[in-house]
């Protein structure tokens, strides 16, 4: 009886399988800090505004 209970606990629920798979894939990608993304977008915006004012 305990072995069947153990098997039920180790098998993931079908609705959770996608979340677990997504979490595993996330570790393989390059991580960029949100501060860097915001800073880069602000810098690009300022550069575009300055260039349009000059020309």
Curated annotation (Swiss-Prot):
<dbReference type="InterPro" id="IPR016482">
    <property type="entry name" value="SecG/Sec61-beta/Sbh"/>
</dbReference>
<keyword id="KW-0472">Membrane</keyword>
<keyword id="KW-1133">Transmembrane helix</keyword>
<keyword id="KW-0813">Transport</keyword>
<protein>
    <recommendedName>
        <fullName>Preprotein translocase subunit SecG</fullName>
    </recommendedName>
</protein>
<feature type="topological domain" description="Cytoplasmic">
    <location>
        <begin position="1"/>
        <end position="33"/>
    </location>
</feature>
<feature type="transmembrane region" description="Helical">
    <location>
        <begin position="34"/>
        <end position="53"/>
    </location>
</feature>
<keyword id="KW-0653">Protein transport</keyword>
<dbReference type="GO" id="GO:0005886">
    <property type="term" value="C:plasma membrane"/>
</dbReference>
<comment type="function">
    <text>Involved in protein export. The function of the beta subunit is unknown, but it may be involved in stabilization of the trimeric complex.</text>
</comment>
<dbReference type="GO" id="GO:0015031">
    <property type="term" value="P:protein transport"/>
</dbReference>
<keyword id="KW-1003">Cell membrane</keyword>
<feature type="topological domain" description="Extracellular">
    <location>
        <begin position="54"/>
        <end position="55"/>
    </location>
</feature>
<keyword id="KW-0811">Translocation</keyword>
<keyword id="KW-0812">Transmembrane</keyword>
<comment type="subunit">
    <text>Component of the protein translocase complex. Heterotrimer consisting of alpha (SecY), beta (SecG) and gamma (SecE) subunits. Can form oligomers of the heterotrimer.</text>
</comment>
<dbReference type="InterPro" id="IPR023531">
    <property type="entry name" value="Preprot_translocase_SecG"/>
</dbReference>
<comment type="similarity">
    <text>Belongs to the SEC61-beta family.</text>
</comment>
<dbReference type="Pfam" id="PF03911">
    <property type="entry name" value="Sec61_beta"/>
</dbReference>
